[in-house]
Amino acid sequence: MQTKDIAELLNEPACTHNTKSKSGCARPKPGATAGGCSFDGAQIALLPIADVAHIVHGPIACAGSSWDNRGTRSSGSTLFRIGMTTDLTEQDVIMGRGEKRLFHAIKQAVNTYSPAAVFVYNTCVPALTGDDISAVCKAAAEQCGVAVVPVDCAGFYGTKNLGNRIAGDAMFKHVIGTAEPLPVPPASQRDGITVHDVNLIGEYNIAGEFWNVLPLFDELGLRILCSLSGDARFREVQTMHRAQANMVVCAKALLNVARKLQTDYQIPFFEGSFYGVTDTSQAFREFAQLLNDPSLTARTEAMIAREEAKINTLLDPWRDQLRGKRVLLYTGGVKSWSIVSALQDLGLEVVATGTNKSTEEDKARIREIMGEKTKMITDGSPKALLGAVKEYQADILIAGGRNMYTALKARIPFLDINQEREFGYEGYSGMTELARQLALTLQSPVWEAVRQPAPWVINHA
């Protein structure tokens, strides 16, 4: 990838910070290695597309050390769970066999699994040796009769967030707009209800949590053309250009896709979240507002009133147990504010939140929810996190899996909120699961036990 192409991806017109004198995303600082590379970002953005063969072109470690690190779920094909790599060795590099190995890997994947398409992820070694993956993908597509999409995402290009944008750019250039959606099936048509086509961008169906919300879309007459990329299929991605409205769930990841769909196809979009009662209701209201259908607006308000009444009845016992507990939230992106809203719905007090991967829009939403004097944390080192827990007198640390052992070694209750988790928290029904996990964590008898002096210390005293 050329330097000018990387600079263009870093410069996102849809971000508000582009209006400042120094526009574009901040470049990574030397030594700031935590957080993943461009390859990691591109792979986790596209890997949930379930019926595609995902081939990592590079040494075995690039695939082996990162495969399936996003806990997405599929309702059908499980092809995306199969790790494929060209497994480049030192001899392959010396002899210049990289392109040949890639071509044969694509053929083998097509012959063995008959995928809907093949995605090829470029990594550092073949990028440095100059393998022309675009030419190889084009030749393989002509011979195999299957779409082969090059994703040029070598790790040294930049950060994980840049990789997300590279993935979105590849989808827009090579996939979106290459097929038309099927007509609405008769079973989905109801008298007096107009079916509207919508997309979700940056929704990854972690732990199957989007399935909590999907029935509500069906009830309202909203047909999801594509959820990029949780539980998605290749053909669904091809038809995204025919939606009437888009919802961006994770702004920092795939905002460029929403912006280009708006520019080229005049599809309006909004940024929202399905975490928490308030934000879930607001997301459906935003869809109704963008689609400008009075009947849809009426159905939406009726559905929201019903679901909120039902979930509030279920949450009241949990709120009695959780009210007043202090939470330190260290995550990033959309979760830095959407999880805050969900926790506040449960009566917890969020004393500080992490903003290491949050956009300017995310930070503005945090201030709107928590107030102008809210504490934002950018240093995620173990020492800094433990210091923040002590300073703000937090009862629990909610963060990603990499911070789990930091909390447990310090005998601090911990709840995993990032992509590796096993529980889904989206939608109205997801709130009961979030409340249950918080209560189980905070009320576990293990914390009282581990904070007691060891028996030999007591005996010695």
Protein language model features and the residues they cover:
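An N-terminal assembly and electron-transfer interface module characteristic of large anaerobic redox
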Residues: 1-461
